[in-house]
Structure formats: structure tokens, C-alpha cells
Curated annotation (Swiss-Prot):
It comes from Saccharopolyspora erythraea (strain ATCC 11635 / DSM 40517 / JCM 4748 / NBRC 13426 / NCIMB 8594 / NRRL 2338). InterPro entries: DUF520, UPF0234-like_C, UPF0234_N, YajQ-like_sf. It comes from the Bacteria. Nucleotide-binding protein. This is Nucleotide-binding protein SACE_6882. Keywords: Nucleotide-binding.
Amino acid sequence: MADPSFDVVSKIDRQEVDNALNQAAKELANRFDFRGTGTRIQWSGEEAITLESETEERCKAAIDVFKEKLIKRGISLKAFDVGEPASSGRVYKVTGKLVQGIAQDVAKKISKKIRDEGPKGVQAQIQGDQLRVSGKKKDDLQTVIQLLKSSDFDVALQFENYR
């Protein structure tokens, strides 16, 4: 029998992000403090979201509304990288990108943390934009999952294919 293993990934459920975007757009259209400010939120390509408003403050408030909806939908804010409002004519625009996948340098940090602080006999292999963690006992893998959940990395981590 093969050793137990699991994958550490950073993925976003695009449908949940779309639901959060639609909820935020509905709230921006109905809220009293956003009336008449021309505040809009929409997709900008596959992995980016654009917010527009007449004032910088309304733009930042719209970002907060969208972040609140992301949290309610169970999406980590580490997966949403938002820039600063930039003026273009009479409108302020902000573009936020959805971050998926674990970068090589972050994967190395995670692997090093597992080697240094994790149980003995647990290995982590970097496989593209994810990590495969394997060990002799399932209890050791549970310990590694708890270790990674308690650590603060710059990406939202999920654990899948636990077998």
C-alpha cells in the first residue's frame, strides 16, 4: 500500500467569487451612500475585477463591501490582491486580481517549514503550483495540516486529495 499523502493547493472557486461580485454589485446599487456616485463593480477578464467610482473614498468603501462579500462566501482575502485607486479623468478605478497557485518561493518556504517543524518521516515535494505532502502515518499528516493552518503564508491554502 502506498504512503498516505495530501496536496497543498491555492485555488479559488470562481463561482463563489462571481456570487460575491453579484451580491456586492446589488448592494452598491441599493445602498443610500452609493446612490449617484456611479459606483460599479465588474469582471475585467478571467482573473481580475474592476471597481469604478467618482470619489476615492467611495472606491475604497466599495472594495470593503466586496471584501465583506468574499468573506461571507468563504473565500480568503489572501486570494484577492487589490491595488490603489487611480484617477482617470472624472472616475477613480481600482483593479483587483485573483491569486491562484502557490509561487515557487512560497512553496519552498512551506516545504522548509514542514521539514523543520513537522514530524519526522514527512516529505514535501513541489509539483508545479502545488505541494504533495506524504508520510508514513495519517496522524503525522494531520499534524502537518494543523502546522500549516497555524502558519501565516501570503497565499490562501487548501488541502485536498487526502488519502
